[in-house]
Amino acid sequence: MALGLEDKKAIVAEVSEVAKTALSAVVADSRGVTVSSMTELRKEAREAGVYVRVVRNTLARRAVEGTDFECLAESFVGPTLIAFSNEHPGAAARLLKAFAKTNSKFEVKALAFNGELIPAGDIDRLATLPTYDEAIAKLMSVIQGATSKFVRTLAAVRDQKEQEAA
């Protein structure tokens, strides 16, 4: 279906607006994936706070101009699905990596984070980033471990001094 100029401008504006506020982006090729699988992917993306859109390459290039994701422009070749993470940098990478495992025809082309182009083979760099809550939990466990070790050391010193005094 041919898109009119106004429709194209609206798509570019929408994708550009999302790109300006997104934390990371993933570009993939969804050629050969069934409609029901894509519908399921879109549903999971909404739940994960990930914006997913199939966009024409020229429109995608225009949409990412002047954003951190301009480095992705060369990966807009062939059918292009672009996913932006809005809440957590690794959300889109994690979602599309899991989807690619169950759909052999789905292929991740490239990723971008902080203006850096990341090859598809390095998807784990983003996919394994802990969420904010996970990072806080890890930090708290490290602090708690260090604190409890310090308290045990103080108790041992106290017990040792009590034994020497007795």
UniProtKB/Swiss-Prot annotation:
InterPro entries: Ribosomal_uL10, Ribosomal_uL10-like_sf, Ribosomal_uL10_bac, Ribosomal_uL10_bac_type, Ribosomal_uL10_CS_bac
Gene Ontology MF terms in the entry: large ribosomal subunit rRNA binding; structural constituent of ribosome
UniProt keyword Transmembrane helix present: no
Pfam families: Ribosomal_L10
Superkingdom: Bacteria
Gene Ontology biological-process annotations: translation
GO CC annotation: large ribosomal subunit
Keywords carried by this UniProt record: Ribonucleoprotein, Ribosomal protein, RNA-binding, rRNA-binding
Record's subunit section: Part of the ribosomal stalk of the 50S ribosomal subunit. The N-terminus interacts with L11 and the large rRNA to form the base of the stalk. The C-terminus forms an elongated spine to which L12 dimers bind in a sequential fashion forming a multimeric L10(L12)X complex.
PANTHER family, per the entry: 39S RIBOSOMAL PROTEIN L10, MITOCHONDRIAL (PTHR11560)
Function: Forms part of the ribosomal stalk, playing a central role in the interaction of the ribosome with GTP-bound translation factors.
Family, similarity comment: Belongs to the universal ribosomal protein uL10 family.
Protein name in the entry: Large ribosomal subunit protein uL10
Organism: Marinomonas sp. (strain MWYL1)
UniProt lineage: Bacteria, Pseudomonadati, Pseudomonadota, Gammaproteobacteria, Oceanospirillales
